[in-house]
A protein has these predicted regions:
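Compositionally biased regions
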Residues: 10, 37-45, 49-51, 82-84, ...
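General secretory precursor processing signal
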Residues: 5, 23-26, 57, 104, ...
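Interdomain boundary/hinge segments at the C-termini of tandem beta-sandwich modules
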Residues: 31-37, 109-113, 183-184
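Serine/threonine-rich, repeat-prone extracellular segments and beta-strand-based repeat modules
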Residues: 1-17, 70-102, 107, 144-181
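Solvent-exposed, low-complexity, repeat-rich "mucin-like" stalks and linkers
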Residues: 38-70, 114-144
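N-terminal cationic amphipathic segment used for targeting or macromolecule association
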Residues: 5-6, 28, 32, 41-43, ...
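Thrombospondin type-1
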Residues: 1-40
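Hydrophobic beta-strand residues in large extracellular and virion-surface proteins
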Residues: 45-47, 63-65, 80, 93-95, ...
């Protein structure tokens, strides 16, 4: 069989030979082709979180990178960089191949206005009618009046019987988070 003189590595050819088993004379030599780096561009990238609430701090989700069923190692097989990851909008994480890997792949995630910082007005005690009771809600974020259906959704529970009802106002679109209020 072949005896390896020098193993091939990425970008570097190797060599091997066959020798006589009795006298050890080299009978044949051959080149081992250089190994090529594998492109990371088709890797699947999973983020630990895809939506963040804005708080002025850089958002860096955890990253899992898989290629051909193998989970790659951060620092060994790839490096991670983030861009546009502090302000409200679309942020990006870029995975760049390292070591045995080449190329890059990117994934985006969202940073949305923190709906919990919105102010809600128009919730008051209502008289029992035997019907579902709703409220004339106004939601403001940094002084701007938000639109029901576009910026938030409203849902009610326990709002037909006498007692405490709950209204849940959930951020939508460029807002994330939920505000819960009660009324009687």
């Amino acid at each position: 069989g072949w005896i390896v003189n020098k193993a091939a590595s990425i970008g570097v050819k190797g060599s091997k030979h066959k020798e006589c088993t009795v006298c050890k004379k080299v009978l044949e030599t051959a080149e081992i082709p250089a190994l090529s780096r594998i492109s990371i561009s088709k890797a699947s990238v999973t983020l630990s979180t895809s939506t963040y609430a804005y708080d002025g701090k850089a958002k860096k989700p955890g990253v899992t990178v898989k290629l051909n069923g193998k989970t790659l190692k951060n620092g060994t097989d790839y490096t991670v960089s983030y861009s546009n990851n502090t302000k409200v909008g679309t942020a990006k994480v870029t995975i760049t191949g390292k070591g045995n890997y080449t190329g890059s792949v990117s994934k985006t995630y969202s940073i949305k206005n923190n709906f919990k910082k919105a102010t809600v007005s128009g919730i008051s005690t209502k008289a029992f009618t035997g019907k579902n009771i709703t409220q004339s809600i106004t939601v403001k974020y940094n002084g701007k009046t938000l639109k029901n259906g576009t910026d938030y959704t409203v849902s009610y529970s326990n709002n037909k019987k006498i007692g405490t009802a709950t209204v849940k106002i959930a951020g939508k679109g460029s807002y994330t988070g939920t505000i819960t209020k009660t009324f009687k």
